[in-house]
């Protein structure tokens, strides 16, 4: 086993509680507990964003994962009610170099350690996150475990090795809504960054594979009536809402395992309705169109990924561990965006149907707003399909 330790100045020596991180390949990192006591197992991944830790922690796409933040200072701005992307934290665990016990921000109502404790999230700080990131970049994302109660590396390693791989894992059932509901809250005017239409009289059914709240806010900000439905909702029930378009949301796990979602997308393609997919929804659309997906070595998780194809580049927020295989796309599907770091498919559209999707997150939260126009594009497709009113 490789043993790596680190340091941290968030708490005094007397207040620190030992914690342990063990990876599936036997690497061991010694640090200190942050949050709840206990043991958690999950896929260890890294996020390179310098801001937005609260949005990351509450993003349902991180379900089943232990997130290591490469930015060394976490928690300086505390936690607030407005930046939640779901009703609770979704990560399995948190890894940080340093976690601030005291916060300073006018919107914050509690510290990050208190928030983790409140929601029973196990975390570890004080480790060399740079070394961890370089290791994951070289060897690939892998399962790992954090524990404040099992401090024997061999014992924790045995539990990690027994955990299932993310490849082949369907986690959508853990994050989808259990019943339909209508979302009505637009982006707060305090943070509104685009002059968009506010009344469109358009109904969007959003299939919830683990949807982020800011996606729903952006759709509502463009005047859409948004009906959110569970991931396994049959096509007949979706059509009963008489949608002008259907949105396929982000979410966690291996897209190839979401069989209900893929079959629903295939049925929706036959209706001619405008379809828009983001992240997992993009992958599900690709699979419905006959493409294949594959697992990336360490994924794309951060706020500064350049995407484009020819003359225009967008800086995007990303969070995914799978991608669509470009050589598996049929002749009716056009690649609209590539991730310019590794040339993987970042966007596609159907050549004949009002269907498009992107691998990244145009709603940001956190991240840049370069791609917000995609919501306007979706609205335009729905508007063009509506019958022209008789004068």
Curated annotation (Swiss-Prot):
Residues 203-388 form the Glutamine amidotransferase type-1 domain. Keywords: Amino-acid biosynthesis, Arginine biosynthesis, ATP-binding, Glutamine amidotransferase, Ligase, Nucleotide-binding, Pyrimidine biosynthesis. Gene3D superfamilies: 3.40.50.880, Carbamoyl-phosphate synthase small subunit, N-terminal domain (3.50.30.20). Residues 1-199 are annotated as: CPSase. Transmembrane segments: none annotated. The active site is at 279 (nucleophile), 361, 363. It holds the Pfam family GATase. L-glutamine binds at residues 61, 251, 253, 280, 283, 319, 321-322. Its EC number is 6.3.5.5. One of its GO terms (biological process) is 'de novo' UMP biosynthetic process. One of its GO terms (molecular function) is glutaminase activity. Pathway: Amino-acid biosynthesis; L-arginine biosynthesis; carbamoyl phosphate from bicarbonate: step 1/1; Pyrimidine metabolism; UMP biosynthesis via de novo pathway; (S)-dihydroorotate from bicarbonate: step 1/3. It catalyses: hydrogencarbonate + L-glutamine + 2 ATP + H2O = carbamoyl phosphate + L-glutamate + 2 ADP + phosphate + 2 H(+). PROSITE patterns: GATASE_TYPE_1. Small subunit of the glutamine-dependent carbamoyl phosphate synthetase (CPSase). CPSase catalyzes the formation of carbamoyl phosphate from the ammonia moiety of glutamine, carbonate, and phosphate donated by ATP, constituting the first step of 2 biosynthetic pathways, one leading to arginine and/or urea and the other to pyrimidine nucleotides. The small subunit (glutamine amidotransferase) binds and cleaves glutamine to supply the large subunit with the substrate ammonia. Composed of two chains; the small (or glutamine) chain promotes the hydrolysis of glutamine to ammonia, which is used by the large (or ammonia) chain to synthesize carbamoyl phosphate. Tetramer of heterodimers (alpha,beta)4. Belongs to the CarA family. HAMAP family: CPSase_S_chain (MF_01209). This is Carbamoyl phosphate synthase small chain. The lineage of its organism: Bacteria, Bacillati, Cyanobacteriota, Cyanophyceae, Synechococcales. The gene is carA.
């Amino acid at each position: 086993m490789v043993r790596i330790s680190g340091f941290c100045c968030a708490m005094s020596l007397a207040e620190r509680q030992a914690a342990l991180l063990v990876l599936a390949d036997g690497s061991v990192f010694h640090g200190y507990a942050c949050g709840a006591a206990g043991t958690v197992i999950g896929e260890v991944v890294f996020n390179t964003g310098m801001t937005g830790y609260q949005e990351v922690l509450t993003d349902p796409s991180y379900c089943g994962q232990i997130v290591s933040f490469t930015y060394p200072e976490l928690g300086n701005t505390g936690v607030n009610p407005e930046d939640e992307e779901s009703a609770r934290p979704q990560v399995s665990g948190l890894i940080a170099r340093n976690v601030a016990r005291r916060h300073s921000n006018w919107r914050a109502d509690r510290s990050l350690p208190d928030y983790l404790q409140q929601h029973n999230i196990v975390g570890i700080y004080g480790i060399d996150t740079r070394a961890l990131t370089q290791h994951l970049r070289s060897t690939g994302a892998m399962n790992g475990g954090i524990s404040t109660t099992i401090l024997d590396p061999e014992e924790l390693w045995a539990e990690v090795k027994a955990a299932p791989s993310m490849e082949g894992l369907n986690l959508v059932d853990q994050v989808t809504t259990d019943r339909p509901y209508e979302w009505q809250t637009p982006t707060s005017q305090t943070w509104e960054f685009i002059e968009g239409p506010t009344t469109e009289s358009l109904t969007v059914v959003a299939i919830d594979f683990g949807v982020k709240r800011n996606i729903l806010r952006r759709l509502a900000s463009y005047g859409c009536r948004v009906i959110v439905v569970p991931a396994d909702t049959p096509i007949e029930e979706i059509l009963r809402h008489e949608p002008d378009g259907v949105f396929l949301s982000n979410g966690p796990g291996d897209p190839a395992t979401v069989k209900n979602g893929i079959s629903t997308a295939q049925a929706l393609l036959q209706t001619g309705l405008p379809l828009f997919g983001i992240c997992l929804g993009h992958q599900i659309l690709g699979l419905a169109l006959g493409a294949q997906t594959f697992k990336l070595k360490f994924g794309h998780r951060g706020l500064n990924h350049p995407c484009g194809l020819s003359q225009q580049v967008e800086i995007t927020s990303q969070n995914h561990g799978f991608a669509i295989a470009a050589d598996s796309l049929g002749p009716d599907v056009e690649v609209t965006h590539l991730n310019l770091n590794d040339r993987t498919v970042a966007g596609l559209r159907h050549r004949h149907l009002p269907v498009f999707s992107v691998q990244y997150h145009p709603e940001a939260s956190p991240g840049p707003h370069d791609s917000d126009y995609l919501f306007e594009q979706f609205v335009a497709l729905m508007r063009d399909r509506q019958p022209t009113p008789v004068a």
